[in-house]
From Swiss-Prot:
This is Beta-galactosidase. Homotetramer. It comes from the Bacteria. Na(+) binds at D202, F602, N605. One of its GO terms (molecular function) is magnesium ion binding. Binds 2 magnesium ions per monomer. It catalyses: Hydrolysis of terminal non-reducing beta-D-galactose residues in beta-D-galactosides. Substrate binds at N103, D202, E462, E538, Y539, A540, H541, N605, W1000. The record marks H358, H392 as: Transition state stabilizer. Keywords: Glycosidase, Hydrolase, Magnesium, Metal-binding, Sodium.
Length: 1024
């Protein structure tokens, strides 16, 4: 044990937090989570241990601007002005200091290993009681599961130790410091340390004791470590559980270790042995270690599909059977290996349906509770995810147990990121920083290696490629050869990775960056000598209204076996709750706490909002990742299962044939599909509709019974086909009425019964409509070529740093947002049964014509207004965001009804999950409440739209809400939006894709850009 004077002044003088060679003082060695059961049955059933005591709850707390400001007296007693704070928590979430959101830029001046003199410091203290029995025998430990970023610990006024690495436990022996009865802990937490230079992750920078604190009482002679691994024969019919156990304390001849393996209530295997390990070299072996091997016939294999678990109980006892203590862990029999360029689990090539997940809670910051963790896992499973990357640090210990039990593949990632360094490998190639990096990698492996869900180790994130990475790669491969290692830094295909694991590489487009090119994922596989699998560690940047082009990735994954999937960036928006002056909560992002530097809303890249409400894009991910694929030939549906291990035993296939959303026939067939098998379903002869319309066959795979992660009735997969329809023509009903045209100097006015249409001759716009005496429009019907910018449109542009390549900057520079209409033509003609208004406009900016829009409005005797639009786009202007029409309707109706793709928001490059049907939703549901307001709520493939007294028919896209594009564009946060008068309607003949390969460069694929020079569309507007 390192001995240091208890004086605070001496501790401060040492400045351990500015010494990369000091990562801990007196911290105990890493190991899997312990409970020290004194009853083996409690260990088997994972009941709470009487030897493990939580110290979570209210602690005393005082905040200081720097450690030097902490008074020496605090070591002995609480300060008069100390407050209370909940542990675990981030102190910034309790009004102390401010959270800082930054992506790449370090939040402190870069001068490693030194940190600012103004180094916010939190002083925690807790008074607790210890029973005399804990002091008479054994060892009492204190475990801090997570403290950011470094801390010193005192007990009863005496210095105990020091720890850093905010995402792994720091554990200390308190035995020599405790007394029977009342004891006092004092923990001094520093916001910044030299470890902060290794923790430059894209997240909020927060501080404090943010994970659990507990006391653990172990016997004097104790289990100090244990590790389980599974080995198999070629066909997985026989397995061996290999358990390595290490003890410490008095090594006596009478000591024995028993490892028993349980499957539920049944003991499958057991073995007992005295201590004395295998011979290592000519000097012998380890006297305090032992390896046991238990044979298991026909093991129930673990996978994310079927997470079969056994329970291993490790008992330390005497020869006569007297139990000293027991430890235990869940065991999953599974094998991970790379063979012939494929990542295999239990001999089958995996397809990673993955997502990156930060530990984030909108109210609690980086504090994770079990309820939130389970909620995340259930949502992931329900949306066809099978893997999660712990980005970018080891997670709360409970997370891995839950992934074991519910079934998720885990990439466990070391808490190392130096993204803000120049060059990025400045520290990771420096041997002075190897001890700090080594602690972060080795301790992660030692803590988590018993978890079957952990199938890949990661050396960290965005830290370049240095010699330290190569050393740590070799260490992992020597200690745990059962798992591959991945690391993206330095180009994603260095010597430090078993898997090509790029981030944001595109399907077909090379990005030839200097030193670290990102090849297209298809090309990467064919590079000379490249035989590794490719799994994208990050792709599909889900920032705001995004995930366009996601289907292209999944087409490639299914086409090329060595393209084995990837991890979407990312799971949850990292917004935080703030309160306005009236106590109303609102969602905040970078800069909202006065934090500098900050990267604004770049913290919100989630498939779900911070409160776990899904983004519409989550449905697209679910659909593309679904485990059943479908093919239609005539009346035959072929269902293919992509499950590797699971036989469909809880699935029904529902099919429906509908004409314009009206069901004509339906049925239900049980699915009985072997893993990777097929089932052919023959449909009956389908009825032929008598009327015209779109005929669609829709299939849904429904789970009739509840599972551990889904309720009964859960839909896991679906598909639609448009069927051939009989050719027929429905003639409009004859009308004897003829609209009446009145011409004045200012207007053309058309009347028919109780309806009137007014066209302004000076503007050329439809300026008003009446039904009876009620006006229908608050603004004229105008052409529209812009949208409120998406995050993907903005890229890295901001007020102080313009990216001229970003779509929004190109649109602004070209004048798309400022364009004014110059009237070229506005005429009226009376036809035999209708009135025809013809208009033409040149949309100009600073004398330059950007668009020419020609429209005809044909109002017939039935009251229908048929609108025909032709648009010419100037060849030298950027491709527009949309080509459509917009107006502000006077009504506010409760519901919106449409025939088209839905029900969720969808866009041209993100619509594979949308179904064609007749949908009816509240108006409020047509708006997607992205925290950073933008274009939202589009519905594509629309044949009919009904709202209030109005109906629109044609083939168009629309969005409808209380917010104008102008307001969405000018507003920084959703809570600042105000419902405008009436309802804003946008009807588009064409709309550009949204992109999403990344959010900092134009990522809309060419096929989804509006690159043609001419566009034509039609629609009919009438009243019901």
């Amino acid at each position: 044990m390192t001995m240091i004077t208890d004086s605070l002044a001496v501790v401060l003088q040492r400045r351990d937090w500015e010494n990369p060679g000091v990562t801990q003082l007196n911290r105990l060695a890493a190991h899997p989570p312990f409970a020290s059961w004194r009853n083996s049955e409690e260990a088997r059933t994972d009941r709470p241990s009487q030897q493990l005591r939580s110290l979570n709850g209210e602690w005393r707390f005082a905040w200081f601007p720097a450690p030097e400001a902490v008074p020496e007296s605090w070591l002995e007693c609480d300060l008069p002005d100390a407050d209370t704070i909940v542990v675990p928590s981030n102190w910034q979430m309790h009004g102390y200091d401010a959270p800082i959101y930054t992506n790449v830029t370090y939040p402190i001046t870069v001068n490693p290993p030194f940190v600012p003199v103004e180094n916010p410091t939190g002083c925690y203290s807790l008074t607790f009681n210890v029973d005399e029995s804990w002091l008479q025998e054994g060892q009492t430990r204190i475990i801090f599961d997570g403290v950011n970023s470094a801390f010193h610990l005192w007990c009863n006024g005496r210095w105990v130790g020091y720890g850093q690495d905010s995402r792994l436990p720091s554990e200390f022996d308190l035995s020599a410091f405790l007394r029977a009865g009342e004891n006092r802990l004092a923990v001094m937490v520093l916001r910044w340390s030299d470890g902060s230079y290794l923790e430059d992750q894209d997240m909020w920078r927060m501080s404090g004791i943010f994970r659990d604190v507990s006391l653990l009482h172990k016997p004097t002679t104790q289990i100090s470590d244990f590790h389980v691994a599974t080995r198999f024969n070629d066909d997985f019919s026989r397995a061996v559980l290999e358990a390595e156990v290490q003890m410490c304390g008095e090594l006596r001849d009478e000591l024995r270790v028993t490892v028993s393996l349980w499957q539920g209530e049944t003991q499958v295997a057991s073995g007992t042995t005295p201590f004395g390990g295998e011979i290592i070299d000519e000097r012998g072996g380890y006297a305090d270690r032992v390896t046991l091997r238990l044979n298991v016939e026909n093991p129930a294999l673990w996978s994310a599909e079927i997470p079969n678990l056994y329970r291993a109980v490790v008992k330390l006892h005497t020869a006569d059977g007297t139990l000293i203590e027991a430890e235990a862990c869940d065991v999953g029999f599974r094998e991970v290996r790379i063979e012939n360029g494929l990542l295999l689990l239990n001999g089958k090539p995996l397809l990673i349906r993955g997502v990156n997940r930060h530990e984030h809670h909108p109210l609690h910051g980086q504090v994770m509770d079990e309820q939130t963790m389970v909620q995340d896992i259930l949502l992931m499973k329900q949306n066809n995810f099978n893997a999660v990357r712990c980005s970018h640090y080891p997670n709360h210990p409970l997370w891995y147990t839950l992934c074991d039990r519910y079934g998720l593949y885990v990439v466990d990632e070391a808490n190392i990121e130096t993204h803000g360094m120049v060059p990025m490998n400045r520290l990771t190639d420096d041997p002075r920083w190897l001890p700090a990096m080594s602690e972060r990698v080795t301790r992660m492996v030692q803590r988590d290696r018993n978890h079957p869900s952990v199938i890949i180790w990661s050396l960290g994130n965005e830290s370049g490629h240095g010699a330290n990475h190569d050393a740590l790669y070799r260490w992992i491969k020597s200690v745990d050869p059962s798992r591959p290692v991945q690391y993206e830094g330095g180009g994603a295909d260095t010597s430090a990775t078993d898997i090509i694991c790029p981030m944001y590489a595109r399907v077909d487009e090379d990005q030839p960056f200097p030193a670290v090119p990102k090849w297209s994922i298809k090309k990467w596989l064919s590079l000379p000598g490249e035989l590794r699998p490719l799994i994208l560690c990050e792709y599909a940047h889900a920032m705001g209204n995004s995930l366009g082009g996601f289907a292209k990735y999944w087409q490639a994954f299914r086409q090329y076996p060595r393209l084995q999937g990837g991890f979407v960036w990312d799971w949850v928006d990292q917004s935080l709750i703030k309160y306005d002056e009236n106590g109303n909560p609102w969602s905040a992002y970078g800069g909202d706490f006065g934090d500098t530097p900050n990267d604004r809303q770049f913290c919100m890249n989630g498939l779900v909002f911070a409160d776990r409400t899904p983004h519409p894009a989550l449905t697209e991910a679910k659909h593309q990742q679904q485990f059943f694929q479908f093919r239609l030939s005539g009346r035959t549906i072929e269902v293919t299962s992509e499950y590797l291990f699971r036989h469909s035993d809880n699935e029904l296939l529902h099919w429906t044939v509908a004409l314009d959303g009206k069901p004509l026939a339906s049925g239900e067939v049980p699915l009985d599909v072997a893993p990777q098998g097929k089932q052919v379903i023959e449909l009956p002869v389908l009825p032929q509709p008598e009327s015209t319309g779109q005929l669609w066959l829709t299939v849904h795979v429904v789970q009739p019974n509840a599972t551990a992660w889904s309720e009964a009735g859960h839909i896991s997969a679906w598909h639609q086909w448009r069927l051939a329809e009989n050719l027929s023509v429905t003639l409009p009903a004859a009308s004897h009425s003829i609209p009446h045209l009145t011409t004045s100097e200012m207007d053309f006015c058309i009347e028919l019964g109780n309806k009137r249409w007014q066209f302004n001759r000076q503007s050329g716009f439809l300026s008003q409509m009446w039904i009876g005496d009620e006006k229908q429009l608050l603004t004229p019907l105008r052409a529209q070529f812009t949208r409120a910018p998406l995050d993907n449109d903005i890229g890295v542009s901001e007020a102080t740093r313009i990216d001229p390549n970003a779509w929004v900057e190109r649109w602004k520079a070209a004048g798309h947002y400022q364009a004014e209409a110059a009237l070229l033509q506005c005429t009226a003609d009376t036809l035999a049964d209708a009135v025809l208004i013809t208009t033409a406009h040149a949309w100009q900016h600073q004398g330059k014509t950007l668009f020419i829009s020609r429209k005809t409005y044909r109002i017939d005797g039935s009251g229908q207004m048929a609108i025909t639009v032709d648009v010419e786009v100037a060849s030298d202007t950027p491709h527009p965001a949309r080509i459509g029409l917009t107006c502000q309707l006077a009504q506010v109706a409760e519901r919106v009804n449409w025939l088209g793709l839905g029900p969720q928001e969808n866009y041209p490059d993100r619509l594979t999950a949308a179904c064609f049907d007749r949908w009816d939703l509240p108006l409020s549901d047509m708006y997607t409440p992205y925290v950073f307001p933008s274009e939202n709520g589009l519905r594509c493939g629309t044949r009919e739209l009904n709202y209030g007294p109005h109906q629109w028919r044609g083939d168009f896209q629309f969005n409808i809400s209380r917010y104008s594009q102008q307001q969405l564009m000018e507003t920084s946060h959703r809570h600042l939006l105000h419902a405008e008068e009436g309802t804003w309607l946008n009807i588009d003949g064409f709309h550009m894709g949204i992109g999403g390969d990344d959010s900092w460069s134009p990522s809309v694929s060419a096929e989804f850009q509006l690159s043609a020079g001419r566009y034509h569309y039609q629609l009919v507007w009438c009243q019901k």
